[in-house]
A protein has these predicted regions:
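Membrane-embedded alpha-helical bundles that constitute the cytochrome b-like, heme-associated redox core
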Residues: 1-185
Length: 185
């Protein structure tokens, strides 16, 4: 009797990290948030001509930031790899809330930035003139700017908390969560 035994089929292994596009978008947003926040904090130390140049750079990077954030949200809703939460049951709601805030606040921040520019008008690098919207004014622009600035501080605070949570997973829990945002080797 000839009995043939085959090896059991390998079980499908769930991916342990996000896809490359998601990872690139994540780290691009991290760099843009850090650069934009730090630049905005230092911008008022510049002399007048340099000050206008720095604002033009901030506005340009803000437009790039808005585009990347919008693409990131669309990517995550459609093609991006979904991984299950690694947190215990009690932390799942907090994790979901943090991630929702980290998606929505950058969108709100970008819209506020656009509102600032449209409320007062701007000459971008002295080349492109963005006109003031009807009903716009410098006082309105300043009010929107105040909200934009506070929203940026909230984003940096939450992003710092997010980073600290990732480090907690890495060094205290040692559960491999931080590896999810590293490129596969």
């Amino acid at each position: 009797m000839n009995v043939s035994v085959t090896a059991p089929a390998k079980a499908a292994v769930a991916p342990s990290c996000y896809d490359a596009v998601t990872i690139w978008l994540h780290w691009t947003i991290v760099v843009l948030v850090a650069a934009q926040w730090l630049g905005a904090e230092l911008i008022d130390f510049a002399d007048r001509p340099t000050h206008k140049l720095y604002w033009s750079i901030h506005i340009t990077l803000g437009c790039l930031f808005a585009a990347v954030v919008i693409f990131h949200v669309i990517w995550r809703m459609t093609a991006g790899r979904k991984l299950p939460t690694s947190n215990e049951e009690g932390w799942k709601l907090a994790t979901a809330a943090m991630h929702m805030l980290l998606y929505w606040i950058p969108l709100i921040l970008a819209l506020l930035g656009i509102g600032i520019v449209l409320a007062r008008g701007w000459s971008l690098f002295g080349i492109v003139n963005i006109p003031m919207m009807p009903g716009g004014s410098r006082p309105l622009s300043r009010e929107i700017h105040e909200i934009h600035e506070w929203t940026a501080h909230v984003l940096v605070f939450l992003a710092t908390g997010h980073a600290l949570a990732a480090l907690y997973h890495r060094y205290a829990l040692k559960d491999g969560v931080l590896r999810r945002m590293q490129f596969e080797r």
